[in-house]
Design a protein with these regions (language model features):
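Conserved Class I S-adenosyl-L-methionine-dependent methyltransferase catalytic core
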Residues: 12-16, 22-25, 32-33, 53-171
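Alpha-helical subdomain
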Residues: 1-64, 69-70, 167, 172, ...
Length: 333
């Protein structure tokens, strides 16, 4: 939204209310409850334990957003909610997406008072979110839910890569930070002679292996539990794929180069900025949020990644853009 009037600005400043109302609906399963049986405010309040009058305002707000419709004094999901919510992702995926958004919100508490902090802006009474390795390592069930969520929402990305990556001469693939193995699975389905190894946190690997078994791919898709920045990694790959990982640098690229066979390739896929100060809005949102935890957080540009690769003795071979907007950079040792 690009506000052009005072009214637009005032509405934008209150948009957190609509966001919180929607997030609560996702976490509490409201749309699925009403899809089973339309209910009035009293019925929803009784089912979810929400005070009736508050529930009435909540339902009216969601209705004003076009997500609910009132049928004979009972609420049901609108046609747009059925398409964009119920038919898009599973209930647990939506619930976890909403939970993650809620857990990030403390970074914005008293932001005007804390934005000058050189490091984290998180309020002193609020713990900052641990990094990925810590989060996935400490909570096995959360890691399982997170892994399955990404498997679901990254299906379109996996299809894009399976349809576009040049896999000529690639028989062994390392999927670095590959989580559920969603991209590897798409590539394995397309290339019968390919075998892949996902490297990720132990709890994520366990959940990913379950998904591989469900897809009857456990013989061709292996999972190697490791912290890829510190632990020893397997070698002998024709390609290392680093997709949506967000960790880059000369030292890491040199490490990955040592894992490749002669003429092996490194392929990096992410939402990089085309140039400094030029980035997609979704990337700007994530970058601003990240900067509230790390004051000097920066968005990598395509040129910066290519420079790091050259410094690590890689030859950049290609650069392309997927329909989703992600940029694909290919390099060879």
């Amino acid at each position: 939204m690009q506000p052009t009037t005072t009214g637009d600005l005032l509405e934008l400043m209150e948009s957190y209310i609509a966001s919180a109302a929607l997030g609560a609906a996702m976490e509490l399963g409201l749309f699925w409850l009403l899809a089973e049986q339309p209910r009035d405010a009293a019925g929803v309040g009784e089912a979810l334990g929400v005070p009736e009058k508050r529930c009435e305002h909540w339902l009216e707000l969601l209705s004003s957003m076009g997500l609910l419709e009132e049928l004979a004094k009972a609420y049901a999901p609108s046609s747009s909610a059925r398409t964009a919510i119920l038919e898009a992702y599973s209930q647990d995926t939506w619930a976890l997406l909403a939970q993650e958004a809620r857990e990030q919100f403390p970074a914005f508490h008293d932001l005007a008072l804390r934005i000058r902090e050189p490091d984290s802006t998180w309020a002193p009474q609020e713990p900052t979110l641990p990094d990925y390795v810590a989060r996935m390592g400490e909570r096995p069930e959360r890691a399982r839910r997170f892994t399955r969520m990404l498997y679901e929402i990254h299906q379109p990305l996996a299809d894009e890569l399976a349809n576009s990556l040049d896999m000529t001469g690639v028989e062994r693939l390392m999927d670095l930070g590959g989580g559920s193995g969603v991209v590897s699975l798409a590539l394995l389905h397309r290339h019968p002679r390919l075998a892949a190894t996902v490297v990720d946190v132990a709890n994520v690997c366990k959940a990913g292996h379950e998904i591989a078994v469900e897809n009857s791919m456990e013989e061709r898709l292996a999972f190697h539990a490791a912290d890829f920045l510190r632990d020893e990694l397997p070698r002998g790959f024709d390609m290392v794929l680093e997709c949506d990982v967000g960790i880059y640098g000369e030292a890491l690229f040199r490490r990955l180069g040592a894992l490749l066979n002669p003429d092996g390739r490194l392929v990096i896929v992410d939402r990089f900025a085309r140039a400094e100060g030029v980035a997609q809005l979704s990337l700007l949102y994530r970058a601003f949020l990240a900067s509230l935890g790390i004051g000097d957080f920066t968005i990598h540009t395509v040129v910066e990644i290519q420079t790091m690769l050259a410094q690590a003795d890689f030859q950049v071979l290609s650069e392309s853009t997927l329909p989703s907007g992600r940029i694909v950079i290919g390099a060879r040792t």
